[in-house]
Every structure is written in C-alpha cells, then in structure tokens.
Amino acid sequence: MEQEQDTPWTQSTEHINIQKKGSGQQTQKLGRPNSTRLMDHYLRIMSQVDMHKQTVSWRLWLSLRNPTQGSLRTRALKQWKSFNKQGWTN
C-alpha cells in the first residue's frame, strides 16, 4: 500500500477527533481525511442538494398542475392585493 506523504494539503486538512472516555476525560486523536472519503462526502452532499431541488420543483409543478383550494385562495389574494395597490387609476 502507498502511504500519503506530508504535503501542505494533507497538513492543512489534519483534523482532531475528540472522543470521551467513560470517566469524562477527553482524548485527542489526530488523523487525516482520506481523499476518497472526502470525495465520497462531497458527492453525498451534492446528491442530497440535487434531491432537495428536485423535490421542491416537483412540488411546485404539482401545485400548479393540480391547485388545491388553499393555493387558489392564496393566488387570488395576491392578485387582489396587487390590483388594489395599482388603484382605480386605469
């Protein structure tokens, strides 16, 4: 197996894991994040973001496609308010 060499990148990405013992004392363990783990973490986060975006756009599409009574009421109120702001000048 090939070991990672100490480079400015690996030195700057060192992190500390603090674990509590049963007596309440803390021990510190130094370690470097594996580049594979970092990439895996990044891909997992981006996947969650994409899923959230898809969920939001799907809900929006459904609300426009099959409007509920509440969404119709909200839309009508917004139009009424904007109409009242313009006034009767037309």
Swiss-Prot record:
Q: Which parts of this chain are annotated as the region Disordered?
A: 1-34
> What stretches pass through the bilayer?
none
The miscellaneous annotation reads:
Is not encoded in all strains, and seems to be dispensable for replication.
Major location, coarse class? host cell
Name of the molecule in the record? Protein PB1-F2
Q: Where is this region: Mitochondrial targeting sequence?
A: 65-87
Summarize subunit and interaction data from the UniProt record for this chain: Oligomer. Interacts with human SLC25A6/ANT3 and VDAC1. Interacts with host MAVS.
Name the source organism. Influenza A virus (strain A/Hong Kong/5/1983 H3N2)
Q: Which UniProt keywords apply?
A: Apoptosis, Host cytoplasm, Host membrane, Host mitochondrion, Host mitochondrion inner membrane, Host nucleus, Host-virus interaction, Inhibition of host innate immune response by virus, Inhibition of host MAVS by virus, Inhibition of host RLR pathway by virus, Membrane, Modulation of host cell apoptosis by virus, Viral immunoevasion
- Pfam family name, one: PB1-F2
What cellular-component terms does GO give this entry? host cell cytosol; host cell mitochondrial inner membrane; host cell nucleus; membrane
Annotated site (Low pathogenicity): 66
Q: What does this protein do?
A: Plays an important role in promoting lung pathology in both primary viral infection and secondary bacterial infection. Promotes alteration of mitochondrial morphology, dissipation of mitochondrial membrane potential, and cell death. Alternatively, inhibits the production of interferon in the infected cell at the level of host mitochondrial antiviral signaling MAVS. Its level of expression differs greatly depending on which cell type is infected, in a manner that is independent of the levels of expression of other viral proteins. Monocytic cells are more affected than epithelial cells.
